[in-house]
A protein has these predicted regions:
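Active-site rim beta-loop-alpha module in soluble metabolic enzymes
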Residues: 56-131
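Short, charged, surface-exposed secondary-structure boundary motifs
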Residues: 42-48, 64-65, 92-93, 159-163
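Short, acidic/small-residue loops that bind anionic groups at enzyme active sites
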Residues: 24-48, 137-157
Length: 170
């Protein structure tokens, strides 16, 4: 890669979607690991459990996320437990009424646990730091075992860093 891409070990596109920037970057920099946080989160989650589910923001995101997961998995899979929309906006996650946001995230996590999710993915970069709320929701659903909670931003940084450290391209 030339220009700014020549100075980086990899790229994480921090938008929780099947983002079109990823294939573009892979085309111009084929020796550079490039992921979006949806892909990174799903890949991490698959290593942690058998029924991966996503908690996201608005209901309008669900069809796109479902399609993105199918693309990552190569089709429909019983390992994908689906996506639950919280109805919260991206900005609202961080600046909205804290009690409402917390209760909504806990409720969605409880619903996911009842639906059999054994790994829960935070389906928005704005959900970073909400792992504890998700764990509370899982407990409120009566689950006695902990459920891994995957933050796609963290997963992306670690995935790209790990790939870069392996020097697969020599």
């Amino acid at each position: 890669a030339d220009g700014p891409l020549a100075q980086v070990a990899g790229v994480v596109v921090c938008c929780f979607s099947d983002h079109p920037l990823v294939p573009m970057l892979r085309h111009v920099a084929p020796a550079l690991p490039v992921v979006h946080i949806l892909e990174a989160a799903v890949l991490h989650a698959l290593a942690l459990g058998n029924r991966v589910g996503i908690l996201t923001t608005g209901a309008a995101m669900v069809p796109d996320l479902d399609a993105g997961v199918r693309r990552i998995l190569g089709g429909a899979s019983p390992r994908y437990a689906g996506c639950i929309a919280t109805g919260l906006g991206v900005v609202e996650l961080q600046t909205g009424d804290r009690a409402k946001v917390d209760a909504t995230v806990r409720h969605a996590a409880a619903q996911g646990a009842r639906q059999g999710m054994d790994v829960i993915v935070l389906g928005c970069a704005g959900m970073t730091g909400m792992e504890g709320l998700v764990q509370q929701g899982v407990r409120e659903a009566g689950r006695t075992t902990r459920v891994p909670v995957v933050d796609g931003s963290k997963a992306g940084v670690h995935l790209v860093g790990g790939i870069a450290a392996c020097h697969y391209w020599g």
